Structures are given as C-alpha cells and as structure tokens.
C-alpha cells in the first residue's frame, strides 16, 4: 500500500500558529471563567500540559500526561469540569476557525491522492483530544474519513519532534519505513521525520521555525506547488 503523511495546522489548515492559540485560549478562558476558573491559572495548566506532552516518554498516553499536569497546576480533579471542557471542544472551539485561513486546495490535494490510490495519514502532533482535531479537520474542508489514521492525544504516547511519535504511527499502521513522504510546515516538528527515514516536503506558506533552525527538506514549495507536484506522482 502507498502512504503519504500530512501535518494539519499550517499545512492542510493554513494558519499562523500564534494567532490560533491566542484565539483558542480566549474562547476557552471566557467559557471557563463563568464557572469561576481563573484564566491565568487555566492557561498555565494548558501550557504546562503541552510542554510535558511534547516531552512525553512513552510511559503513558498524552491524555494521561496532560491531566496529571492539569491537576497539579489547577489544584482540582480533572472531573470537576470535564463535562464543560468536553462541551467546549464540541461547540465554542469551532469559533476559532476565524484565526485560520482554510484553502480549497486542501480538498483538491486529498482527492488527487485518493484517486491515485494513496492512503493518507494525518500526522498532527497529538496535543488535543479527538473532538478538537476532528473539528479542525472539518475547518480545512476535509473529513476524518479522508484519513486512514489520525493521531490524537487519547491514543499516542509521544509528540513531534520525538522520533518515537513517527515510529508509533508506523507500528499502528503495521508497516515498515520505506521512505514515506511527510508533508508539513514546521521546521522543528515535521522535518525531524527525516531522522526517522521519511522524505520531507516543506510547505512554505506558513513556515514555523521557532528555534530558528537550519533546514534542508527534500522538497519545498507553496500549497499550490505541492498540489502540482502530487498530481504528477
């Protein structure tokens, strides 16, 4: 079988990451402040949880790692507001689409790959629950059914750029590395897949390079360039 791997944020769903995070945090803190939750403490819990998930060592899922961090910072059980948080990701979270720039090319890209018989993997760093990731897929004009596998925090034990993340995907697909193509916009996170044997395509419309790293992808270009390239496969 033929596989191609995609990042989501900034790639299939064009966005400036910081703009999205600010919008997301504002929406969440606005909702939770109605229940007496202090916004700063909640943001601290989210940031600490994200940091620890990014550095997860494989001994527990990212979801389990996050809630340990959340309870430590918030000083309350995760069960206190679990229903409200789950509801947020199903409802108000969708308002954050205004911080993104959906492009019809995403739909065309996935369709052309399906027409060519490719299995498409959504290799988005699993920092979010499934509901939040599925909704962002829909913002991009896609559906969860477009992908043979989607990485969410409920099921994964690592995050990008940990090589364990990429190996976990291969293991879950029950495939061996054969130089599969990883497509993304983040220098540190997506291009790290080269160390796991992937070929890389850097989408340049919304490059993220927080650590100001030097980089040399196998290929690079805009989302339009990517579409033209994939049509020729």
Give the location of each predicted region.
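Short histidine/acidic/glycine/proline-rich micro-motifs that form metal-
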Residues: 12-14, 52-53, 124-128, 155-156
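Short, acidic loop-to-helix structural element flanking the phosphoryl-transfer center
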Residues: 61, 80-83, 90-121
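Asp-based, Mg2+/Mn2+-dependent phosphohydrolase catalytic module
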Residues: 1-4, 111-112, 125-127, 133-233
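A metal-dependent, Asp-based hydrolase signature
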Residues: 47-90
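Active-site neighborhood of HAD-like aspartate-dependent phosphohydrolases
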Residues: 1-45
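Hydrophobic alpha-helical core bundles mediating ligand binding, dimerization, or RNAP-core interactions
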Residues: 21-29, 46-50, 67, 85-93, ...
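Short, solvent-exposed loop/turn segments at secondary-structure boundaries
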Residues: 16-19, 57, 214-215
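Short, flexible loop segments at the rims of nucleotide/cofactor-binding pockets, characterized by
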Residues: 96-100, 129, 157
């Amino acid at each position: 079988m033929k596989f191609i791997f995609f990042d989501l944020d900034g790639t299939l769903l064009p966005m400036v990451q910081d703009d999205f995070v600010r919008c997301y945090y504002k929406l969440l803190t606005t909702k939770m402040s109605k229940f007496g939750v202090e916004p700063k403490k909640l943001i601290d819990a989210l940031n600490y949880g994200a940091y620890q998930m990014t550095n997860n060592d494989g001994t527990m899922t990212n979801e389990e790692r996050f809630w340990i961090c959340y309870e430590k910072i918030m000083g309350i059980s995760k069960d206190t507001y679990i229903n409200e948080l789950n509801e947020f990701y199903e409802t108000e979270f969708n308002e954050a689409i205004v911080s993104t720039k959906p492009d019809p090319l995403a739909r065309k890209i996935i369709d052309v790959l399906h027409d060519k018989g490719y299995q498409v993997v959504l290799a988005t760093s699993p920092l979010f629950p499934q509901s939040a990731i599925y909704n962002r897929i829909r913002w991009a004009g896609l559906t969860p059914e477009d992908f043979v596998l989607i990485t969410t925090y409920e099921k994964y034990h690592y995050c990008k750029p940990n090589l364990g993340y990429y190996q976990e995907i291969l293991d879950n697909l029950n495939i061996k590395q054969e130089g599969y193509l990883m497509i993304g916009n983040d220098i540190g996170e997506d291009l790290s897949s080269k160390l796991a044997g992937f070929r890389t395509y850097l989408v340049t419309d919304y490059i993220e390079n927080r650590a100001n790293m030097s980089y040399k992808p196998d290929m690079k270009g805009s989302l339009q360039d990517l579409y033209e390239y994939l049509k020729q496969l």
